Each structure stands twice: as C-alpha cells, then as structure tokens.
Amino acid sequence: MKGDMDLSVLPNNNHPDKFLQLDVKSLMRSSTLLQASLARFPGGNYPATQHWQNLVYSQREKTIATQRIKGFGVENPVLPESPPASMSSVMKNNPLYGDITLEEAMEERKKSPSWTIEEYDKHSVHTNLSGHLKENPNDLRFWLGDTYTPGFDTLLKKKKKRNKRSKLCHMGLILLLVASILVTIVTLSTIFS
C-alpha cells in the first residue's frame, strides 16, 4: 500500500512521516505586519527581525540530533518526557495535549476488551450499562427520555380524563344493562307465576 502512494504530493516529501506538521523554522514576518507592530515598542526599541518557530518540531529535531551524537539509532522511537508537575491544568485539559500514561492505558484497554457487563461497568466512564439493558424499548419513555415538549403534559392530562370518562360510561352502561335484565326477569317471573 505504501509503495503505491505518490509522496511527491505531500507538503514535506522528504519526510512523509511529518505530514501535516508545520515545517516552520524561521518564518519572517512580512514587512507590513512588522511596521504595524512597531508602534507597540516605545522609544524605538524593537528587534530588527522577528522569527516564528515551531517549538515542537524544533524539540524533536534536537532530540534526534542528540541521540545521533550519543550513538543511539534513529530507529528507536523518541518518547517525549513527562510534563513538569507545575504544568497548568488549562494545558492538561487541552485536547491537543497527549499524556503518554493515558495513551498507554487506552492501548492496554484495547488489548484486553471487556466482554461482560460487569467488567464494562468497572472500566467504563459510562457505568450504567446494565441499567440501560433492563429498560424496555417498547416503552415510549425509553425513546423520549428526558425530552420535554411544551403542552405535552396538558395533552396527556386531557387523554387521561377522556379515558377515565369512557371507562365510567362503559361501567354505567353495563350496570344499566344488568339492572334492565334483572327488572325484566323479575317482571316475567311475576307474570308467569
């Protein structure tokens, strides 16, 4: 599959493994942006040229270079060091921040998946799978969940009243029928006796 790919279309065709990484080592600011930002430096104390650097890319290049000097092979994977304890929680909550211990834990979970509901409940963030399995999908409340529709309560109340009224009417008709049958039986028995 890799042999069929045309690597010349990649942005950095010398290193296809660095696809979609910024290859910015010294990107000069344009002269219009530089002149616009000169007003920020009072008294004319401003740097002659300003450079942008991709620090992640630069750090990787430096670690690979130091490993070459020390005699380590490039084939060994370069593992980033763990972040310092003083790292802010904002950075740790950033979705682009990847902690190696979390990634290793995820890989460990993938190697040994949970096949029972109890194991899934123990290891999962969503711990109520067994409760969801007990619910009946034929029940309307299963599909509605906690959704609220304005006016739905009043419609339900009207429907309940209508059902109750119809039940009472049926009971009244049955009682009337039973009473009329009893009256006819009593009258017929008195006439023929």
From Swiss-Prot:
Entry keyword Hydrolase: no
* An example molecular function term from Gene Ontology annotations: cholesterol binding
Offer one Pfam family short name for this entry: MINAR1_C
A Gene Ontology biological process noted in the UniProt record is: neuron apoptotic process
Tissue-wise expression: Widely expressed in the cortex and Purkinje cells of cerebellum. Expressed in the inner ear, mainly in the hair cells, spiral ganglia, the spiral limbus, and the stria vascularis.
Q: What happens when the gene is disrupted?
A: In an experimental Parkinson's disease model, homozygous knockout mice lacking Minar2 display severe motor deficits such as rigidity and bradykinesia, gait abnormalities, reduced spontaneous locomotor and exploratory behavior. Homozygous knockout mice lacking Minar2 present with rapidly progressive sensorineural hearing loss (HL) associated with a reduction in outer hair cell stereocilia in the shortest row and degeneration of hair cells at a later age.
Q: Which UniProt keywords apply?
A: Endoplasmic reticulum, Glycoprotein, Lysosome, Membrane, Phosphoprotein, Transmembrane, Transmembrane helix
Task: State the annotated membrane topology for this chain.
Answer: Single-pass membrane protein
Give the residues annotated as coiled coil: none
Q: Which GO terms describe its cellular component?
A: endoplasmic reticulum; endoplasmic reticulum membrane; lysosomal membrane; stereocilium
Phosphoserine occurs at which residues? S82
| Sequence intervals crossing the membrane | 172-192
- InterPro entries associated with the record: MINAR1-like, MINAR1-like_C
| Residues listed as glycosylation sites in the UniProt record | N128
Compartment(s) where it occurs, according to its Swiss-Prot or TrEMBL record: Lysosome membrane; Endoplasmic reticulum membrane
Has keyword Cytoplasm?
no
Q: How does it assemble?
A: Interacts with NOTCH2.
* Described purpose of this protein according to its UniProt entry: Binds cholesterol and may regulate the distribution and homeostasis of cholesterol in hair cells. May play a role in angiogenesis.
Protein family (similarity comment): Belongs to the MINAR family.
Name it. Answer: Major intrinsically disordered NOTCH2-binding receptor 1-like homolog
Native species: Mus musculus
